[in-house]
Amino acid sequence: MNKKRKQKTYLRGIYAERLAGLWLQMKGYHIAARRFETRFGEIDIIARRGHVIAIVEVKARLTIEEAMEAVKQPSEKRFDNAANIFLARQPDRKKLRLRYDLIAISPWKLPRHIEGFFHPENF
């Protein structure tokens, strides 16, 4: 991939993550972290609503189906490891419940938020 194409892809990802964050806020979530980095990898968005911590992967693709297919099992393990690091830092962690979501961004469509898209115990 050439440098210009990489930059375009990066910027598309940034735009998709911002749009996803706004969508979550409109649904009543508080954005706790964006691009949360650990030694295991990065989580696009960590959002909270009540006692639910949503670990959100954002995928921008031409169709919702392509976005759903873009999440792979090794990524899911990365999310779980990074999510546990975030959770360990929360003072009320015993009351919190983790959920792993996907927000699919497609051109000319509203974002699609799929709650509980994957479950780490299925790895």
What are these regions (language model features)?
Residues 1-34:
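Acidic-basic catalytic patches of nuclease active cores, encompassing PD-(D/E)XK
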Residues 106-123:
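Short, C-terminally biased terminal segments at protein or domain edges
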